[in-house]
Amino acid sequence: LASEISQRFETWSSFRRTWTNEKKEIRDYVYATDTKTTTNSKNGWANSTTTPKLTQIYDNLKANYEAALFPRDVNFRFQAGNAEAASIVKATAVQSYMEAKVRQSGFRTTVDRLVDDWILTGNAFATVDYSREFTETEEGEIIQGYNGPTVVRISPYDIAFDPTVAEFKNTPKIVRTLKTMGELHIKALTDPATAEILSKMMKNRSEVGHSGGQTEKSAGFIADGFSSIENYYQSSMVECLTFYGDIFDRSTNTTLVNRLITVMDRAYVVENKPNPSWLGTAAVFHVGWRSRPDNLYGMGPLDNLVGLQYRIDHLENMKADVFDLIASPVLKVKGEVEDFVYAPGSKIILGEEGDVGFLVPDSTVLNADLQIQNIEFKMEELAGAPRQAMGFRTPGEKTAFEVENLSQAANRIFNHKAARFEIEFLEPILNAMLESARREMNTLEIVSQVDNGTGAVFFSEVSKEDITSKGTIVPYGARYFAESARRIQTLQQLVGLKANMPDVGVHFSGLTIAKIIADEVKEPGLFGQNIQVDETLETQKIANDAAVDLEEDQQNKAEAGL
């Protein structure tokens, strides 16, 4: 099994070498400070300035995607699957527990890195783990840390799979991770099987370390990221390949279905067990930015723009070189000319047919600024990030209705991609976190809850039974982002209609409009039924009391002759 899994990882990784090189070129351009580290270095221009247009588009996309995915503190809700789960107690317990774990586990920080992968490579991969963190003090006291589900980023370069399968959840997957020898030593203290394998691994490292020459090993032992097998064995890192899916075991002539198999050093199987997830498939998730036909690897928003970035840098440095030649042109010397000093006021003695002049390049190339501007504008549109989304207004006067229609049309690609990330990626991840908690939770959890009516915060205990109910977690950040803009625009029109047309306004509920406004601005304490009446009465009461006090004070002063 170890050799089979190692060979599959090596084979699947080799099939995507071209894809890996393309992503490296994109990364080079995004983080470049000059053209010397990009493919533009082959142009041969004296200037090597890079215009970071691809970087600006990347930053713009990332900022807008994150604003769309997380427009508010709570960006998901629990949808009950039956009457029992729909009870207020059950639904509130699940919602409160997941809100607490998303907040405590650094979910947003991890998603931030996943959005990076999604934009730069066109693919994001993640899995879910259950963490039990604790710290032991010098006095032996155990301090409990985070206990709950976490989302774990998988680098697009550390996962290999068969991209020809119709759906990602059905394809076998191999995830590569690196562990330290210290982590294995700690596990070996309580696991005899790990201790035995660790002993063999240390022996191999000792033999290779003293061999002094190039040890011939099978391809299954070669670890990615190390220059040689000797360097790998002499390091303190251990490579782990974790296989998810179905595999044929040649040693027993049986097919292992839905297994989780871990291989170390591409030689030792340290874990071989049924997939523990209740979801029925591996808890490894993927989303692509742009789908390819018959290929699970997605295409990124920057893939088609690298050539245009190359063109911008080419024109910019060509223009700079020409400008340098105009400012300091090449000197042309013809015929017999005595040596001279090239300086203001110098005299040049020419022989017969002698001549001195300048070779001035054609200044038409300086008009490249217009071409560069057009290319940059085109790149914005092709990336699905219109200039208006950056705060720049397109030319021309527009009515409010035209502005709304243009905004919706301009952001349609952007909203579609953000909703896809949310539906295909975040939703299964959140549900896998809930499934992991239902399976692994063994203690009571204290979580905070917010009263929607008053905004007050209170705490309650949540048990494993409380969160074990039929239902799903549904994120709605990206969908809320687009819907909220439309709702606020509509509310403004309704409020104006209610004020300007009393005959129509009497049929609109002011109470409902007030509730919606309080919800949209995320201030639950802003709303209270007939609160203005109570506040007016309270203000009037205070004013009346103050008037009585003032009258009594003046009467007392008059009686005292003051």
Regions of interest found by a model, annotated:
Residues 89-306:
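Extended, regular secondary-structure scaffolds
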Residues 49-54, 58, 116-117:
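Conserved core architecture of multi-subunit DNA-directed RNA polymerases
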Residues 74-78, 126:
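Helix-loop-helix transmembrane hairpins and adjacent membrane-interface loops
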Residues 51, 84-91, 104-108, 298-309, ...:
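Generic detection of long, well-ordered alpha-helical segments
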Residues 59-67, 96, 100, 121, ...:
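Short, hydrophobic/amphipathic alpha-helical patches that form generic packing surfaces
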Residues 40-48, 59, 246-250, 272, ...:
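Terpene synthase/cyclase
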Residues 1-49, 111, 118, 126, ...:
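C-terminal anchoring/interaction modules
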